[in-house]
C-alpha cells in the first residue's frame, strides 16, 4: 500500500483499476500487457493522463508486442508515457548489455519509448543492471547521465596504446556529466569521427 512517502510513487496492475482511480498521487504506474487493453482500461486511461504505462510481454516476439501496445494506445488517442519492461536471466554483464541494448534500442529508435525498466533474475549486481539501463537511454538520446566517449577501434596508424589511454581519460573525466569526448588513434579519420564531440584527443599518425 502506498503511504505517500516522499520520493515514492504507487504502482498498480491492470486488475486494480478501481484502486488506481481512487489514489490521489500525482504520478502513478500501471503494469499492463498488450492483452489487457480492454475498453475499461482504455476508458480509465483517458481520464488519468498522470498514469505511466509499464508495458509487459511474455510473447516470443516481445518487441513486436511492445510495439503493438503503443500503436493501440496511439489509435485510441492516448498520450500516456510508456516504459518498456524487459526480464532477463543473465549471469554475465556483457550478455545482459548486448541483449538489452538490442531489445530496447529497436524500440527507442522507433520513437516509441519514454523509458525502460530492466530486471535481471541472476547474480549480477543491481548496479550493473542500472548502469546498463542508463547507458542504453544515453545512447538513444533519451536521458544523459554520464560523460560520453567516442573512440575509433585503432588501426596500423595508431602509435600508442589506445585502450590504456581511453582508461586514463575516463578516469580523469568521468565526473563531467553531459560532456562528449572523442578519443581517436590518428589525425587521418579522427576529426571526422568525433565531429560532434565537445573535446577531442587525437594521436600522431604514421604515413
Protein language model regions, located:
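Catalytic alpha/beta core domains of metabolic enzymes, predominantly
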Residues: 2-183
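Nucleotide-binding motor/catalytic cores of P-loop/tubulin-like NTPases across gene-expression machines
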Residues: 187-193, 197-207
Amino acid at each position: 500500500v502506498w503511504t505517500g512517502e516522499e520520493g515514492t510513487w504507487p504502482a498498480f496492475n491492470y486488475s486494480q483499476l478501481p484502486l488506481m482511480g481512487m489514489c490521489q498521487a500525482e504520478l502513478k504506474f500501471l503494469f499492463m500487457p498488450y492483452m489487457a487493453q480492454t475498453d475499461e482500461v482504455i476508458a480509465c486511461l483517458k481520464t488519468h493522463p498522470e498514469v505511466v504505462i509499464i508495458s509487459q510481454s511474455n510473447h516470443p516476439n516481445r518487441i513486436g508486442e511492445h510495439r503493438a501496445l503503443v500503436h493501440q494506445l496511439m489509435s485510441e488517442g492516448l498520450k500516456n508515457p510508456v516504459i518498456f519492461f524487459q526480464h532477463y536471466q543473465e549471469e554475465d554483464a556483457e550478455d545482459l548489455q548486448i541483449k538489452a541494448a538490442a531489445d530496447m534500442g529497436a524500440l527507442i529508435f522507433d520513437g516509441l519509448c519514454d523509458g525502460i525498466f530492466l530486471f535481471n533474475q541472476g547474480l549480477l549486481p543491481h548496479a550493473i543492471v542500472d548502469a546498463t539501463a542508463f547507458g542504453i537511454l544515453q545512447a538513444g538520446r533519451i536521458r544523459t547521465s554520464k560523460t560520453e566517449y567516442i573512440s575509433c577501434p585503432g588501426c596500423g596508424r595508431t602509435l600508442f596504446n589506445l585502450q590504456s589511454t581511453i582508461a586514463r581519460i575516463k578516469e580523469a573525466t568521468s565526473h563531467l556529466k553531459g560532456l562528449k569526448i572523442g578519443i581517436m588513434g590518428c589525425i587521418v579519420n579522427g576529426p571526422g569521427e568525433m565531429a560532434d564531440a565537445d573535446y577531442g584527443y587525437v594521436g600522431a599518425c604514421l604515413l
